[in-house]
């Protein structure tokens, strides 16, 4: 029997503040709680799997007979960003946060970047990705400059207009930055942020974003699976997050709708191993932009896909749904990620329905469970498998 695991990360789909949320400035945040109240939120299939039965979830209506097993996962890494969240899902806890730059990057580093790219740098401070285009986009076009900005996350973001700086050139500049940003300046991600438009009112970010991540500090679930001869198919920004480490095939997507379509297509393919999917729009388009209505509608779109996907699952298939952090669209103190628990939903013909796993410490629960199911030794990874508790 072919064993396939479909692990889908709903990027930023948090389910309530973690105990240490106040230390991150995120006390009382709840992404699911915010969107579940909105009329656009219609998620009967997530409900059936047991989303609202998860420990501590007060939103929505519990189902009497969940079709999946479910848990609440608590992050052990000292961070709330995409890179650290995904590394922990893959079994690597980060005890120290990646460096952030609330005052902007050091002047000498920016000067070196200007020298190496031949472009002046504008901004160099934490900024909203859409607001930075309004405030600096026109000047960047006049001066053929690059807009460099950061956020509360460990990121070095470079924005440029595609008409002046071709996408391949922007990617090259980001590779230069990635080479420079090591050690104490070793941010989690360097992100190319191409945009189009001519004026502050018409600028918009294109889908040609590209992330250059730090390499994980040690082998992750992806490496272990690949080394064991399994397929590791990265859909969406998974390849970028792991800097390609442990990936056997990558599929680039342009957003949730496209990512969902690729995932559905993968279901018809023969492979043995892991399809690791990231659906980024929840975070990028709706969480950071504090768009509750858009987030709720995106959840409903994913839920519609679930019905067909579950029907099409084969004998040896497992479906796992989780998140990497929160990004509460109703939280107005910041536009950053929020420190939240994440859901863990598992279903398949080989999974017992309705197993309430309570709260588990460490997103690495996922890596351990996947490795045990696929018969791969995961003793080097963080977390504990729950496979024996949920197998039918």
Sequence positions of predicted segments:
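Feature captures the catalytic ectodomains and active-site-proximal regions of enzymes
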Residues: 1-392
């Amino acid at each position: 029997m072919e064993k396939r695991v479909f692990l889908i990360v709903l990027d930023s789909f948090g389910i309530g503040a973690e105990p240490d949320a106040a230390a991150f400035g995120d006390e009382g945040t709840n992404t699911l709680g915010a969107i579940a109240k909105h009329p656009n939120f219609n998620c009967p299939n997530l409900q059936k799997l047991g989303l609202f039965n998860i420990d501590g979830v007060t939103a929505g209506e519990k189902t009497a007979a969940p079709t999946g097993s479910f848990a609440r996962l608590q992050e052990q890494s000292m961070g709330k960003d995409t890179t650290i969240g995904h590394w922990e899902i893959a079994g690597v806890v980060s005890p120290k946060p990646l460096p952030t730059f609330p005052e902007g990057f050091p002047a000498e580093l920016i000067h070196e970047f200007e020298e190496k790219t031949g472009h002046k740098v504008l901004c160099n401070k934490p900024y909203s990705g859409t607001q930075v285009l309004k405030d600096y986009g026109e000047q960047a076009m006049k001066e053929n400059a690059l807009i460099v900005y950061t956020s509360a996350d460990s990121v070095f973001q470079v924005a440029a207009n595609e008409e002046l700086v071709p996408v391949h050139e922007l990617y090259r500049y980001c590779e230069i930055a990635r080479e420079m940003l090591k050690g104490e300046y070793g941010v989690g991600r360097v992100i190319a942020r191409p945009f189009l438009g001519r004026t502050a009112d018409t600028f918009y970010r294109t889908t040609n974003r590209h992330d250059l991540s730090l390499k994980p500090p040690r082998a992750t679930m992806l490496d272990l699976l690949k080394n064991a001869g399994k397929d590791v198919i990265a859909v969406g920004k998974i390849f970028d997050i792991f800097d390609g480490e442990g990936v056997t095939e990558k599929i680039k997507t342009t957003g949730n709708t496209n990512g969902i379509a690729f995932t559905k297509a993968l279901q018809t393919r023969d492979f043995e191993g892991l399809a690791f999917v990231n659906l980024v729009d929840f975070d990028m388009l709706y969480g950071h932009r504090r768009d509750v209505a858009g987030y709720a509608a995106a959840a409903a779109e994913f839920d519609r896909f679930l019905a067909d996907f579950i029907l099409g699952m084969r004998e040896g298939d497992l479906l796992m749904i989780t998140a990497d952090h929160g990004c509460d669209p109703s939280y107005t103190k910041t536009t950053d990620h929020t420190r939240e628990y994440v859901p863990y939903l598992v279903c398949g013909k080989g999974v017992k329905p309705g197993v309430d796993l309570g709260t588990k410490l460490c997103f690495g629960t996922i890596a351990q469970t996947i490795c045990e199911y696929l018969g791969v030794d995961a003793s080097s990874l963080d977390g504990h498998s729950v496979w024996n508790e949920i197998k039918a």
